[in-house]
Amino acid sequence: VLRPVTELASVLLCENPGIMTLEGTNTWVLRGPGSAEMVIVDPGPDDAEHIGRLADLGPIPLVLISHKHEDHTGGIDAIVERTGAVVRSVGSGFLRGLGGPLTDGEEIDAAGVRIKVMATPGHTADSLSFLVGTRGERSGGGFDAVLTADTVLGRGTTVIDTEDGSLADYLESLRRLHGLGRRRVLPGHGPELDDLEAVSAAYLAHREDRLNQVRGALRILGEDASARQIVEHVYTDVDQKLWDAAEKSTQAQLDYLRG
């Protein structure tokens, strides 16, 4: 069921719940008042029912991709086949049609909505957030919500992908998001949140707490301790089902501390 969240943004939840996806992937549907067309952010996985529900909403000229993970990108070819949409992302592997790669600071006008692209690497190297406002407003203002994808979740904290994610980049991205002030958070998983400034500050504090715990663990376990050893020492407050994910974030913390 398509659920309105703001004047411009509605969410269609994919039925792919899990440890990493929470209730499932949030596919965001952006449409200005009176517009027949819509912009999709993250079509989700290759799920025929989900893609069918999206395609049935109406004309979709443009799909934007927040980052490379399959739970956000797997449905690209299916939605293009159904709608003929142009697909834009940072990575060239996800481009479809003639739109070209997305760039930091770029502004897009489509479906009666103004969308500003913001590079927020860390979770992955290609992670983006999208500021959403209405057409005709002056640049830099009027964006009432931010689609944060997996950089800020609706519940819990984000894993740093050890393939190409970076804690240093992630902390800088959180600081950039914090600087946007009190805007609505429309995440890639979990419920929407009311205050980006507050939640990004909490994320930064959480990361600093974990870094201090890792520093303490290294003093006890030795400087050569593995990420798994540190997880077993530090993450005693976390369900063991999440330890594999915690190991990725801990490896990112070790890489950060070891330079």
Please provide the spans of the model-predicted regions.
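Conserved beta-strand hairpin/beta-sheet module of binuclear metal-dependent hydrolase folds
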Residues: 2-56, 129-149
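Divalent metal-coordination and catalytic microenvironments
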Residues: 8, 30, 42, 67, ...
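Active-site metal-binding loops of divalent metal-dependent hydrolases
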Residues: 15-16, 43-45, 68, 92, ...
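Hydrophobic "anchor" residues on beta-strands that sit immediately upstream
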Residues: 38, 63, 114, 119, ...
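Active-site metal-binding motif and surrounding structural segment of the metallo-beta-lactamase
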Residues: 45-89
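Glycine/small-residue-rich loop that forms an oxyanion/phosphate-binding "nest" at active or ligand-binding sites
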Residues: 87-100
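Divalent-metal (often Zn2+) His-rich catalytic cores of metallo-beta-lactamase-fold enzymes
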Residues: 138, 167-221
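C-terminal regulatory/interaction regions
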Residues: 217-259
